[in-house]
Amino acid sequence: MKRVELEGIPEVRGTVCPPPSKSGSHRALIAASLCDGSTELWNVLDAEDVRATLRLCRMLGAEVDVDGEERLEATVSGFGDSPRAPEDVVDCGNSGTTLRLGCGLAALVEGTTILTGDDSLRSRPVGDLLAALRSLGVDARGRVVRGEEYPPVVISGRPLRERVAVYGDVSSQFVSALLFLGAGLGALRVDVVGDLRSRPYVDMTVETLERFGVSVVREGSSFEVEGRPRSPGKLRVENDWSSAGYFVALGAIGGEMRIEGVDLDSSHPDRRIVEITREMGAEVRRIDGGIVVRSTGRLEGVEVDLSDSPDLVPTVAAMACFAEGVTRIENVGHLRYKEVDRLRALAAELPKFGVEVREGKDWLEIVGGEPVGARVDSRGDHRMAMALAVVGAFARGKTVVERADAVSISYPRFWEDLASVGVPVHSV
């Protein structure tokens, strides 16, 4: 499905259950691989990015048996504190999470590990993370372009020290990589220098490690990791608020959506979509096992800081296209280091619907209006594809989304679920 055509409709109506959390699936697989024993993981996402992490863990010596489709059951027999050197280059595909967290795991290997990915991943900087590993005594090198380091990366040797500093303003995954490294070592102090972007994703890493018996003590901008992971026996990955957000947006713009299997008490940073949607004027109420989102017929522009929830930016931008007034999304400069430069991509694609968009270094402004159908390009980015589909679902006329298959990275059933709530979806 390279290209999808949508026909705009007045309202959506239906029920969806979003897929398992991509972020949670990555973290659970890695934590289980760091154990000496066996762990049963339930509700693991079956999507390209998570398959990349499965491949990484297996290449480092974990035995992973997988059963099911879409929502996997995975039995992981970990490699403990002694991952083996991979026999081949680790291909992380398009998964930045796999590559960055994999750098931390590679530092535990007695030998050399090479990690790479597709063209998009090889354009994403990892210099700050590699510099942190080098400060621990690890030989860590990337491809140098104009003073910055990019994949492929080559990592050899184990850490010689028990304290490390890392900048937190490019990617929170650099911090998470070092926390997993600390768990593998049994002890490490991680000092975060400067602003920590997307801190709730670091909180997810800490929560995962704590569920595996690792102590992580936070003192200001530092994290003290003590103890090695121990299998909890069984662990269930929660459903994904990032994926749920697109259907929250659909219900807010027009109609009513019932979204099952999401937890309003979750620590997932993208749960904030509920708060933002209410602020814009939609109704959201809790039901047993999920939420119901209902349009009130009018959305209003908001000013919102999404520094801690960057994956919500395309979703909020899609809603903003239908809101009265201006929506300003601030402190999201780190979006420029995602699969694509999402700020630039949104600023280029949304105007094709007839919407006015202004872009700054770390902000985006959208002037709401009456979008009309257009031919738009996801640029191979899964979140762009789904956000553009939200706009196309209500835009007047037909919308064509190019590179629609990008959704397979995190939500393989997205187009089927979109059709199930009344949006005419055609593969063209």
From Swiss-Prot:
It catalyses: 3-phosphoshikimate + phosphoenolpyruvate = 5-O-(1-carboxyvinyl)-3-phosphoshikimate + phosphate. GO terms for biological process: amino acid biosynthetic process; aromatic amino acid family biosynthetic process; chorismate biosynthetic process. It is an enzyme of class 2 (transferase). Its EC number is 2.5.1.19. Keywords: Amino-acid biosynthesis, Aromatic amino acid biosynthesis, Cytoplasm, Transferase. It is found in: Cytoplasm. GO terms for cellular component: cytoplasm. Pathway: Metabolic intermediate biosynthesis; chorismate biosynthesis. The keyword Heme does not apply. The keyword Signal does not apply. GO terms for molecular function: 3-phosphoshikimate 1-carboxyvinyltransferase activity. The active site is at 311 (proton acceptor). Phosphoenolpyruvate binds at residues 22, 96, 124, 173, 342, 383. 3-phosphoshikimate binds at residues 22-23, 27, 171-173, 198, 311, 338. It holds the Pfam family EPSP_synthase. Monomer. Belongs to the EPSP synthase family. HAMAP family: EPSP_synth. Catalyzes the transfer of the enolpyruvyl moiety of phosphoenolpyruvate (PEP) to the 5-hydroxyl of shikimate-3-phosphate (S3P) to produce enolpyruvyl shikimate-3-phosphate and inorganic phosphate. This is 3-phosphoshikimate 1-carboxyvinyltransferase. The lineage of its organism: Archaea, Methanobacteriati, Methanobacteriota, Methanomada group, Methanopyri. The gene is aroA.
